[in-house]
Amino acid sequence: MKCKTIQVLWHGKDPVLSVDFNPATGQLASCGTDREIKLWRVGRDAEGNPEVTHEDTLTAHTKTVNVVRFSPGGDALASGGDTGEVLLWRPGVGSTNHHGDATSWRQSGVLRGHSDDVFDLAWAPLGVALVTGSVENTCIVWDVAKTKGVFRLEGHAHYVQGVAWDPRGEYLVSQSGDRTVRLFASRGVPHPIASPRWCKNVSCQEILSRGEENADPSAAPGTARSKPGKQALYHDDTMQSFFRRPAWSPCGSFLATPSGTHKEHAGAREQHVTYLFERDKFSRPAVRLPGLSPAVCVRFSPTFYAKKDASATTTTPTTEADASLVPAKPYRVVFCVCTTDTVTVYDTSETTPLAFIGGLHYAAITDAAWSPDGMTLVVSSSDGYCSVVTFTESELGRVLTPEEVPEHVRGEMPEVRVRAVKEAAERAAAVAEEKREATALAAAEKEKAAAAAAGAGAELPANGPRRVAPAPVADANANANANANANANAPRRVAPVPVSEPAGDASAVPKRIAPEPVADPATTAAPAARRIAPEPM
């Protein structure tokens, strides 16, 4: 095992609040109070030491980003933050962030329903829906395809600080600062997740809040402390952490809840614990895992490991329960418990830790994530850094192939789950394409039938009945007035009147006077001048 706190500016020295691995590509996503989501490539150098390379920065949030989670198929990313922002991202080229840099992911949707901070979210199997937990004391189930809320889970009296979705699709888990864990389920005939009928049957099936408390052996007989009683299972809202992130094992057989507290008896000192419940047996924890400080999150490795030899297995019984209460499985599941300052790695075959890591960070741990191959663990912290822990096969065990895993849990392996999600998406696309083709064909047939009907009406036989289009009847008075006005303005022909001989006195009849030509002054000689003799006075 090698552990290293990577000295890079993950989010500009701001707190890193969540991390998650893409199950399909192995890409790491991180988010924090700088309002950005960053994508990294985690690898190992020539000496086997962990190293990271920055690949993308996604910018669309306007406030702190509290959680980021990839879908089970790795084809989508969901992020939740302050003021109720929940954004969906999908791979896409040609996009740029607010810094002007090209990105390989684009924002594909916004889920609007919360009015206050979202602390945690979890995807449903096959990525058809997701659930978010908010400081409004409620959770919302979202239909991812329609980008709308379909059901609100209520009942908590304080902030919802963690949620988890059963990989078998039956249970929804929410954990709150009110010291309770609630399990919701849709009972009755199975229906598709997030469908209207599924939502109609969802209700709270279990509330985990109280556990058994042993009698105080030092108490006087007959007193209250001398009798067994009940105690709270979880810390109250004075626990200094924004997150209480529960988790399901990849096979769905176990539920782990952090932020637990336990007393051996009424007079004993309170201990910090993490509870491991067996599926459908939530009345009491199967295993109680102690810690030095309050646990804030639990994360399971997505792979299954081969069982250890019986001689190599050691079991440390607990007062609450013994490891023998955990049913034997043909495989092992590995998980980590993160407290505010330590990381402890366990597997389901024993209660003795496989690894214990402390002193990684100067501030509280906020989240953790396992790589798809189950050999790398990344831990985030409020001090602005992330630590990478790498394991070998000799430390965790051999990872089983899909053929070695029981059939009923084979579908939860990362490579099988990614393939199943891809096939489901292809089937959905094929069905949608068939519907589009059927709609287009129906429209074409309808148009063809309408054209045929129109053509048949135009080719009726000559001796058959025909429809005569009515013609409007003109107003006779209006036509007459119009003609009169038109004739008044048009030129008229005057009929000639013949001239006849006058009957009677010829002198009374006007005579025709022959015209006389006027002499041309230019050609006519002027009369000769005459001398006028003067007359004597």
Task: Indicate where each model-derived feature is located.
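Short C-terminal beta-strands that terminate individual repeats in beta-propeller domains
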Residues: T5-H11, E47-A60, T96-T103, Q107-G113, ...
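Structural hallmark of WD40 beta-propellers
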Residues: T25-A29, G74-A78, L87, G109, ...
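Conserved strand-to-loop turn within each blade of WD40 beta-propeller repeats
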Residues: S30-E36, G73, S79-T83, P91, ...
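WD40-repeat beta-propellers
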Residues: V19, I37-V42, V68, V86-P91, ...
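Terminal intrinsically disordered, low-complexity extensions flanking WD-repeat/beta-propeller proteins
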Residues: G188-R244, S249, K263, G267-H272, ...
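Beta-strand-rich domains and repeat architectures in extracellular enzymes and scaffolds
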Residues: L9-T33
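Loop/turn segments within WD40 beta-propeller blades
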Residues: V19-T25, V68-G74, A122-G127, A164-E170, ...
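WD40/WD-repeat beta-propeller blade-loop signature
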Residues: T5, G12-P15, A24, H54, ...
